């Protein structure tokens, strides 16, 4: 006589534990805090280059105008959508999620467990709630408008340099690092072929190569800096050295890709 295995009923909480592996974090909070999980990775198109084309009668091909610094390319923002769900979905939960996602002002850090080595800077455009399913699993679609860069988590770590050093950018896009220059008097910082003269240093000077600003403990100190431009770290290797009263340099390289 055959033996039939008893049919087992899987509770919603068991299902939740089984699928509660993928989530996102935004503005310092995790979707796990709301028992909200992702059904799949974010869906998006590659960022479009900011290029204008002009047709000229009688001439083959368009004239292209890059809306960027000479020799560089600018990329436009990209929309990313996630399908998400939580069990025993209640209006209160949906309201809490919307408050979390839609209340922050300005760009916020967005990261998900499908791509844990990278993050984006994003603003939530919408969090649409769907009807609760027969299994009591409420679904949402989360839409974010993101800057084009996928920032490397590893590229946000501080690297301390105590002497002549070489940094290697693993990506095809030039990075705009943050330097923290320590010293007891003025000196010159060399980043590749770029030279930055710092006329005076009191403990340290912070150089933000994205915003083109210099800071110390008292605030802005751009007047103490002399340079043709703030340096970037192109793809491949860049040598960093210094002279004068500079004693050490810390750098956050801020690597990124698309």
Could you describe each region identified by the protein language model?
Residues 1-58:
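Polar/acidic, low-complexity leader/linker segments enriched in S/T/G and N/D
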Residues 8-12, 83-125:
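Short, acidic/charged, Gly/Pro-enriched secondary-structure junctions
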Residues 23-39, 119-126, 195-202, 226, ...:
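Short amphipathic beta-strand/extended segments with alternating polar/hydrophobic composition
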Residues 45, 109-150:
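Short beta-strand and beta-hairpin "edge-sheet" elements
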Residues 50-62, 69-74:
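Compositionally biased P/S/T/G-rich terminal and signal peptide-adjacent segments
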Residues 64-89, 136-150, 238:
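Oligomerization/assembly interface segments of phage tail-like spikes and tubes
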Residues 74-78, 102-104, 134-138, 171-173, ...:
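Solvent-exposed loop and beta-edge segments used for protein-protein assembly and interaction
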Residues 152-258:
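Intrinsically disordered, low-complexity segments enriched in serine, threonine, and glycine
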């Amino acid at each position: 006589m055959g033996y039939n295995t008893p049919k087992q009923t899987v509770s919603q909480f068991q299902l939740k534990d089984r699928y509660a592996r993928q989530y996102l974090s935004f503005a310092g909070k995790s979707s796990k805090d709301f028992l909200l999980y992702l059904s799949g990775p974010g869906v998006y198109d590659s960022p479009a280059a900011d290029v204008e084309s002009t047709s000229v009668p009688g001439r083959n091909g368009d004239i292209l105008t890059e809306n960027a610094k000479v020799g560089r390319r600018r990329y436009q923002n990209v929309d990313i959508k996630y399908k998400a769900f939580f069990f025993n979905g209640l209006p209160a939960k949906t309201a809490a999620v919307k408050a979390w996602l839609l209340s922050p002002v300005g760009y916020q850090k967005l990261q998900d467990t499908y791509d844990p080595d990278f993050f984006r800077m994003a603003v939530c455009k919408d969090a649409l709630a769907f009807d609760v399913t027969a299994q009591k699993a409420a679904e949402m679609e989360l839409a974010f408008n993101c800057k084009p860069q996928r920032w490397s988590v590893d590229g946000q770590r501080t690297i301390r340099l105590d002497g002549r050093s070489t940094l290697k950018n693993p990506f095809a896009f030039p990075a705009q690092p943050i330097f923290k220059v320590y010293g007891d008097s003025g000196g010159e910082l060399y980043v590749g072929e770029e030279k930055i003269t710092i006329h005076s240093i009191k403990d340290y000077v912070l150089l933000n190569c994205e915003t083109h600003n210099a800071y110390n403990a008292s605030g802005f100190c751009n007047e103490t800096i002399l340079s043709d431009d703030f340096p970037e770290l192109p793809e491949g290797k860049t040598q960093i050295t210094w002279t004068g009263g500079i004693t050490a340099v810390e750098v956050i390289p801020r690597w990124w890709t698309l």
